[in-house]
């Protein structure tokens, strides 16, 4: 599963590539499963469509999905002075206390109060040196999630320039556990019909939860990957998923993660026996070439930003130079990149 490495694999500059703006998808494919699919199988690769997935997998394979749900985490409020403030919820430490990115952060000191359209209010309780953000305690009697639904907005990535996307298209069909500030985008390609066809072929499904957080928005700024620090993200591995993985292995099936977030959750919980420990945890796992995969054998993933930790994770499976060559070919063939773009299927053995 692991690709050969060289010293350039540890330099952030080695993960740069040119991407024409026309390749950045502004709308999702319709229907969901009509996106294109670049299949990497051993030393070969082919160009297919996502609806071909059942025929590309084997009966007895297991797909592990991230069931997190994107919350309306982008808020617009006012300070007592009348100045406007934009808030992005990142991570809770209590139901009504969240680490947030705020703009403008200047002059938003501890004790400052922000009002959100008379529905919610929050007070700054602490500054966060690591992120430059603020800890906010939200006030009010209304249920917090209900209030968020009233005043919050889906935090679409900054490279999406259109406002025409329906919020439900930025959720997977199985999204059930609120807490993410970005979607696990590999799951956006699955339609109800495709899920039914996968089940008919004997391909099983299991879930994990990883609430996608700040790390999605942070490029790797350091010169070397060795000095980059990932932002922590909350995850949970259900007992049923660990059992499904063990059963899949015992029957000769393969474990494929749907998305880098599912992969990071499983690998963060990995034990020496190749099974994930069950229960909740917090992941700061940074995967790049040289990483030894213990649970995940294959991956479904989108096309990622230059110099991103996600690009480095995928490079650990297929090799950096090969991955960048595949990306160049995808650009030439008109593939669509990023959150609403096309996908890759990396089958076990691609990095051999």
UniProtKB/Swiss-Prot annotation:
Pathway where it operates: tRNA modification; tRNA-queuosine biosynthesis
InterPro entries, per the entry: QueA, QueA_dom1, QueA_dom2, QueA_sf
The reaction(s) this protein catalyses: 7-aminomethyl-7-carbaguanosine(34) in tRNA + S-adenosyl-L-methionine = epoxyqueuosine(34) in tRNA + adenine + L-methionine + 2 H(+)
A Gene Ontology molecular function term of the record: S-adenosylmethionine:tRNA ribosyltransferase-isomerase activity
Alphabetized SUPFAM superfamilies for the sequence: QueA-like (SSF111337)
One GO term (biological process): queuosine biosynthetic process
Protein name, as recorded: S-adenosylmethionine:tRNA ribosyltransferase-isomerase
Organism: Gloeobacter violaceus (strain ATCC 29082 / PCC 7421)
Gene of this entry: queA
